[in-house]
Structure formats: C-alpha cells, structure tokens
C-alpha cells in the first residue's frame, strides 16, 4: 500500500488511489499491507476500495478450473466476503489508463484520520470533454456506507454530458447521499 502512496506514476495518474493509500492505517501497516489483501478482506470501510472502484479496476481471479476477469464491483459478496471460490486466488489487479482531461480524488472522514477506520470514504474519477467543463465520464464510489463499497450510479448520471457547475455537483452529491445506507453503530 505504501508504494501506491509514494510512487510518482501513481500520484500522477491515479491521485485518488495515492490519497486513499495515504489515509490507510499507519506507515508500518502500509509498508506490509497489500492491495490484494485489502480487496480480499472486503471490508465495507476499506480505504483503498472506493478509489479502486472509481478507477474502474478489474480483477483476474485464477483457480483450479481456470481464470476469470471481473470488475471489482462484482468481487464483493458482502461484508468481509468475496465471490472467490475455494482454491481461487486474486492473481492480478488491472487499472485502465486514465482518459485525457481527467482527474480523481479520495476523501476520508474518520474521527482520528489515518489511524482510524473510515466513517465515510468517497472517491471520484471525472473526465471532461476536451477544452470544456462538460463531463464525459464520471465514476463515484462510496465506502463505509453499505455492506460493501458501492458505486453511486445515480450521482454519476447527474453529471454525464453536462457542464460541471457548483449546483450540478451539489445535485450529484445529494444523489450519492441517497445511495448511502450506513450502519447505526454509534
């Protein structure tokens, strides 16, 4: 995980992933933790999972019956559960190259920052039409607000094909809020 935080190419091309990695536990844990382990742990509050969802990550899963490639959205089966069968392993994590005129961001809310579990994690990856503020592609993912990390599809749809304004972004945020169903454990 620490490599995701510090590698210049990750910082440049996948800033949401780099920011999510920086918010993940303490440095000692980041030095040992792996992306695959974080995916297979399938925690609803996993810090890097919303960033990976927003970046349209694919997973290559290998087992005795062959291999399959799944979008990360289809890997989670519930809190702490994945669709991996007995004797299957997560062999590869694939990130598409970002489109031109795109950016990504991850924001975590937790009482104590990186040393605490997220009470909310939000990642977005937005691509604009060349030379304009019209949204060509939008992916918004939420963590710690559902049994698994989720995409906020309705919020994404609000932005697609429209010029980004403060009002439109607020409308998308309201749609993302509707997708959130956090547990009541406070």
Per-segment meaning from a language model:
Residues 1-186:
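C-terminal structural segment of proteins
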């Amino acid at each position: 995980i620490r490599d995701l935080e510090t590698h210049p190419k990750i910082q440049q091309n996948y800033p949401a992933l780099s920011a999510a990695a920086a918010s993940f536990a303490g440095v000692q844990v980041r030095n040992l933790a792996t992306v695959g382990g974080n995916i297979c742990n399938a925690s609803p509050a996993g810090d890097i999972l919303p960033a990976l969802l927003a970046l349209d990550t694919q997973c290559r899963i290998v087992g005795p019956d062959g291999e399959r490639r799944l979008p990360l959205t289809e890997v989670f089966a519930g809190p702490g559960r994945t669709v991996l069968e007995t004797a299957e392993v997560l062999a590869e994590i694939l990130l598409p190259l970002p489109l031109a005129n795109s950016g990504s961001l991850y924001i975590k809310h937790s009482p104590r920052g990186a040393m605490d579990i997220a009470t909310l994690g939000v990642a977005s990856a937005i691509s604009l039409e060349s030379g304009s503020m019209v949204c060509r592609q939008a992916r918004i993912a939420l963590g710690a607000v559902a049994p698994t990390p989720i995409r906020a599809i309705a919020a994404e749809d609000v932005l697609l094909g429209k010029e980004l304004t403060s009002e439109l972004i607020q409308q998308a945020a309201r749609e993302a809020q509707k997708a959130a169903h956090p547990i009541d454990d406070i």
